[in-house]
Amino acid sequence: MTPNILPIESYDHQLAEKSARLKAMMLPFQAPEPEIFRSPADHYRMRAEFRVWHDEDDLYHIMFDQQTKQRIRVEQFPVASRLINRLMDALMTAIRAEPLLRRKLFQIDYLSTLSGKLIASLLYHRQLDEEWQQKALELRDQLRAQGFDLQLIGRAAKTKIMLDHDYIDEVLPVAGREMIYRQVENSFTQPNAAVNIHMLEWALDVTQGATGDLLELYCGNGNFSLALARNFERVLATEIAKPSVAAAQYNIAANNIDNVQIIRMSAEEFTQAMQGVREFNRLKGIDLGSYNCETIFVDPPRSGLDHETVKLVQAYPRILYISCNPETLCANLEQLQHTHKISRLALFDQFPYTHHMECGVLLEKRH
């Protein structure tokens, strides 16, 4: 696989290899057969970032070969959405012709949505002034005239210039409903929108008929908690990053959801609050004791759940665990298998043609 060419003909083979690998990893835990969710074979990634190479009068996107560290010129990037590919060409053509915009530009980050919106962030090794801002406004207007629904952002050391705002709104069809998700520049969003829809619909399916409330740790912009709200009486969710919490609050209102409460705290802090170890001002007005959470949802970082959080989740009858690293999932399952058994298993091909696997397990308390 190179940045310019995807081995589309090997898609099925690489997916079968991942499925076999996941089955082997789950063998010690008596997991059921995995449900397999495919990705589109190309143009599946909604985010991309490129370094910018200056070569006399020329200017172009580059990536580095992971093995050889060689520089590769990237004109088109079939991994990324078609919208990003169209903008890459138009943006670079426009910047090439404008010395003020190209000077010390070293990176461009792209974020796109299925709803047709884009953010392009231009990163510089120099201070950005009013003159830059004027040229950036002209660039934005030029690209909008070409049909791009675009937000343009300039970044330099300790500087961020937004010409309008730093977010775009995604609209995802999830099990018969359109869900609105505000996505903030430089904050985490699921990179593969088609697979994200599969994950949300699978999570809805496995929690069908659930009783009580849902607790979610690491909720981000509310991706899962808002979609799952329809299956539960109430949802209590935690998130540490301020921009994500703000986006989640917006998403709750935009989707007319009235049974989700977001708290800004880490999973570790929440564990302390639940165990009564510490009191937090942020929890004033929230009666944790009134929640009857029978299901807990976790989508942790690659490092998995820490020992204390594993102990916390073991107290719940149902654990829904989405993992972007099956190795740390297996390490957590070593502990969880003593109290819970796996009743559903899924493989989501979020990152085709790479060794990375995203998977989901539903664990239910042993009787």
UniProtKB/Swiss-Prot annotation:
Q: What is its EC number?
A: 2.1.1.-, 2.1.1.35
Q: Which InterPro entries match?
A: MeTrfase_TrmA_AS, MeTrfase_TrmA_CS, SAM-dependent_MTases_sf, TrmA_MeTrfase, U5_MeTrfase_fam
**What is one GO cellular-component annotation here?**
cytosol
What are the positions of the active site? C324, E358
> Which cystines does this chain contain?
none
Family annotation (NCBIfam families): trmA_only (TIGR02143)
Q: Which family does it belong to?
A: Belongs to the class I-like SAM-binding methyltransferase superfamily. RNA M5U methyltransferase family. TrmA subfamily.
Q: Which PANTHER family match?
A: TRNA/TMRNA (URACIL-C(5))-METHYLTRANSFERASE, TRNA_TMRNA (URACIL-C(5))-METHYLTRANSFERASE
Q: What does this protein do?
A: Dual-specificity methyltransferase that catalyzes the formation of 5-methyluridine at position 54 (m5U54) in all tRNAs, and that of position 341 (m5U341) in tmRNA (transfer-mRNA).
Q: What is this protein called?
A: tRNA/tmRNA (uracil-C(5))-methyltransferase
